[in-house]
Amino acid sequence: MKNTLDSIALTMLRPALSPLQLMQLCRQAGDATALVDNYDRLEEVLPSPSDKLKTVFQSMPDALDRAKMELDFCEKHQIQVLIPTDTAYPQRLKNCEDAPLVLYYRGNADLNSARIINIIGTRRCTFYGQEIIKNFIKDIKSASPDTLIVSGLAYGIDICAHRNALANGMKTVGVLAHGLDMIYPSMHRETAKEMLSCGGLLTEYPQLTRPDKRNFVQRNRIVAGMSDASILVESASHGGGLITCGISTGYGRDVYAFPGPVTSPASAGCNNLIRAKGASLIT
């Protein structure tokens, strides 16, 4: 429990320290507790800590107070706090160098299911994209019914993927860009509630964290990292789904994309990615 509390405290030092920096520091020191217990004498657990780093760590007492409040909130709302040493922590994600030091999770899905795919794409999906998801998830259900479907609970492709997974009795997890004290967008609240008993909600952000734009980009690495493969359904030429595909490639994961009409802006990103051999074609 102490290492969990200390891990939460370290994340309270963001944005001064990035997730990658936090993981690197923990590896160097041994674990989160070593850093927290020696926050005012970092040279005892780290090789040549900079003055800037020492200054950041001077706020550790306040970070610990906030971490205790967060842990109380999680206990009150049945939220699991997962750190990399926990068996329930997504092991695929754990192998990524910039994995989150802490994850907050509500749900009943196994985050280490034998098969996990993410389904991603534009927020402005077309009827074509919706039909692709509908048929694709039916096919996945027939071939591998225990596959866990991951997406981001956003408008468009994301929510369509979640709802079709639920409709087919498949578990689905939404990775959020904010704390578990809210649902964004609010109109997806009922779907999110249903997912708690047939999948779950996952985030690296504590309560009171708002869905800022930068958080969505950070969220994408979790979507990519916890999955075996990324499935891009529709994307504009510079769509956010392409970011997730790029991260997946960097992690050594498979990337697939559905081709679309050459006249459709919603398929331009998919077609370009396939043409550049950045994704395997799904037909």
Pin down the residues of each PLM region.
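Glycine-biased, small-residue-rich flexible motifs in mid-sequence functional cores and linkers
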Residues: 1-4, 83-283
